[in-house]
């Protein structure tokens, strides 16, 4: 089974949002909705371009 990781732009109530998917599973999604598709895509491109190799920060305090 070939499941891929991808970003998706979709409509929600007439506004645009993005989400990160792994096959049918949603891993992350935008907190904000955008009236303009270009604005949504611009923010998504920043997330995509800046996220590779970033550290995981655990703020739970659990071992």
Annotate the PLM regions:
Residues 25-36:
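A short, exposed loop/beta-hairpin motif centered on an aromatic-Gly-Thr core
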Residues 14-26:
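Extracellular/lumenal glycan-associated surfaces
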Residues 39:
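Residue-level recognition of oxygen-bearing side chains
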């Amino acid at each position: 089974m070939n499941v891929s990781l991808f970003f998706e732009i979709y409509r929600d109530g007439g506004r645009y949002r993005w989400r990160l998917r792994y096959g049918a599973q949603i891993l992350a999604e935008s907190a904000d909705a955008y009236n303009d598709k270009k604005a949504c895509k611009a923010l998504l491109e920043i997330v995509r371009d800046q996220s590779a190799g970033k550290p995981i920060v655990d703020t739970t305090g659990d071992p």
